[in-house]
Amino acid sequence: MNKDQIAVSLMCMDFLKIKEQLEVLNESVGMYHIDIMDGHFCKNITLSPDLIKSFKKVSKLPMDVHLMTTEPNDWIETVAEAGADIISVHAETINGDAYRIYNEIERLGCKRGLVLNPATTLESVKHYLNRVDLLTIMTVDCRIFRAAIY
């Protein structure tokens, strides 16, 4: 498999060894995946926009920032300014507002990502799927704490 097709999640890394781990991964992967959870859409709180800035100091690889948040509008500009290359939002949080959200992401100079939970159908997002640069299909529903993998 081409390393450009591999995105590694940074959520589970050892934060005491960020620099060392990124230096090793930089040689093996094509992109980083950064989960931002707000504690509302998902019952967890994870990485922050400040960490994106730190990651960017150690790596030039693209960073896909996955907004697992109830209100992605509240985060888009902040994560773009922090250094996101791709901003991925959940279909469940943008229906009815998808075109405006994707226009804002594009205006900020980022690529547009869409995330589907296992029960979300492609049919439900067909009207704006053509606006998406990256599609992520979840194997668990992040809204269910300790959910089973589908």
PLM regions with names:
Residues 1-88, 93-96, 100, 111-112, ...:
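Conserved N-terminal beta1-alpha1 strand-loop-helix module at the mouth
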